Structures are given as structure tokens and as C-alpha cells.
């Protein structure tokens, strides 16, 4: 963030979606390393606000995480 002396405010950088920035075409539920970036330590899915993903990719991400949970690739709850 840059400090603007005229108005004494911060200029915010534009948030960019991880998936559009890296030109991902499809989120695969078998890609556990990618999915774990968007899950908390307790196993919950992180929100769009935290991950800076667009609505389209957040929906696909949630579906992929839920499929991976049902296929027992990711635990439902981590203790």
C-alpha cells in the first residue's frame, strides 16, 4: 500500500483471484496440495474475503473440497 500525502489515506491494491491470476482452467478434487491452501487448520473452508477468490472459483473450490472429503482424501475435521 502506498501512503498518499495529500489526503492522508492509503491506496489499496486491487485484490486478484488466485485462480484467474495463475490461469487455472479446472479445480481437481485430487489436487490435495492446492485444496489445503484454502482450508483452515481445523478443516473448515476459508471464505472469499480471506482467500481473495472470485465467486465462480469459490463455488468450484467448495465443491472440490467437499468431493475430496467424501473420497477420504481430506479429513472432515482435523483435531
UniProtKB/Swiss-Prot annotation:
Keywords: Ribonucleoprotein, Ribosomal protein, RNA-binding, rRNA-binding. It comes from the Bacteria. One of its GO terms (cellular component) is cytosolic small ribosomal subunit. SUPFAM superfamilies: Ribosomal protein S18 (SSF46911). One of its GO terms (molecular function) is structural constituent of ribosome. InterPro entries: Ribosomal_bS18, Ribosomal_bS18_CS, Ribosomal_bS18_sf. PROSITE patterns: RIBOSOMAL_S18. One of its GO terms (biological process) is translation. Belongs to the bacterial ribosomal protein bS18 family. Binds as a heterodimer with protein bS6 to the central domain of the 16S rRNA, where it helps stabilize the platform of the 30S subunit. HAMAP family: Ribosomal_bS18 (MF_00270). This is Small ribosomal subunit protein bS18. It comes from Aster yellows witches'-broom phytoplasma (strain AYWB). The gene is rpsR.
Amino acid at each position: 500500500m502506498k501512503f498518499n500525502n495529500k489526503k492522508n489515506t492509503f491506496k489499496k491494491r486491487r485484490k486478484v483471484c488466485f485462480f484467474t491470476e495463475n490461469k487455472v482452467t479446472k479445480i481437481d478434487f485430487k489436487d490435495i496440495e492446492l485444496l489445503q491452501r484454502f482450508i483452515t487448520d481445523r478443516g473448515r473452508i476459508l471464505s472469499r474475503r480471506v482467500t481473495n477468490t472470485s465467486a465462480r472459483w469459490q463455488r468450484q473450490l467448495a465443491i472440490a473440497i467437499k468431493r475430496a472429503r467424501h473420497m477420504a482424501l481430506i479429513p472432515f475435521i482435523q483435531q
